[in-house]
Amino acid sequence: QPPHFRPHGISLYIDTNGKRHLGIINHPKNRELEPENVELFSEDENGLFMHQQTITDPLFKSPNALVLMAQNKFYLGNDKGAETAFGKIQEQLGRPMSKIIYFNGDSASVAAENLSQISGINTSKNNKYLFASETAAKRIAIFSINENNGVLKKLETIKINGSPDNINVSSNDDLIVAAIPKVMALIQHFISFQKEEIMPAPSQVFQIKWDFNSEATIEELFLSNGEDISTTSVGAIFDSKLFMGSITDKKLLICDL
């Protein structure tokens, strides 16, 4: 196992033999001073995931999300991209500077850039399209994937009424997107932890039906003030139920659809 493990983004890949593999972002103790890593695990005969490889690259600046394309190939989304003090100010003011990185099994390269705070990425079931949450711009970016070199070509963006986080893709390629309805409420929620007077923050989940040949349809599946679950960061549909996870709450909320 890695000597230090501070996991963030996680992705599951199932190969043609049915064997499962995990890719997990592993933040260092001192972010911006030490390298960011991606840890690769594979399932053994007992169903346990054993560590296989640690991958690091200077392009892994501020990784937030990743999606495995094969056992050791993946896309990684940096939620920040600025490298200078002035650049960080520009980014805070809204300049899109995030990048999506492609690791081809040997080396990393920039697959897409000039994006607004990537917080979630996923692919269509046929691996021809990649979806990315541009949190600061309140939109989902849709890319076609070049199978030869991993480069992403932006096809369109879908605006939503919230700041998107992680994206799950259903069996019929619908996007299940967790979102932050009010960013200021999220900030107040984080501050309340320091004061030990927990203030709930609203939660939101969208279902987006997207087809290359038609306009996307957006349905709000869930919206609450945060009393039941605060700051939803992920949503998934299984067996006609919506499962939701949170940035801060140590629980899942399950709702009938």
Regions found by a protein language model. Name each.
Residues R31-E39, F86, M97, R139-I142, ...:
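Structural motif
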Residues N161-F222:
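Loop/turn-rich, solvent-exposed surfaces of beta-rich toroidal or solenoidal domains
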Residues T231-L257:
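Blade-level signature of beta-propeller repeat domains, shared across WD40, Kelch, NHL, RCC1
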Residues Q1-I14, D57-F74, K80-A82, R95-I100, ...:
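Beta-rich, blade/repeat-based domains predominating
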Residues Q1, D44-P58, K99-G120, A141-I160, ...:
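Blade-edge beta-strand/turn elements of extracellular beta-propeller
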Residues P35-E45, Q92-G105, E197-D211:
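Beta-propeller blade signature
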Residues I24-E32, L76-R95, A178-P200:
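Short, conserved, GDST-rich strand-edge loop motifs in beta-rich repeat architectures
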Residues H21-G23, K73-Y75, Y129-A132, D174-V177, ...:
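Conserved beta-propeller blade signature
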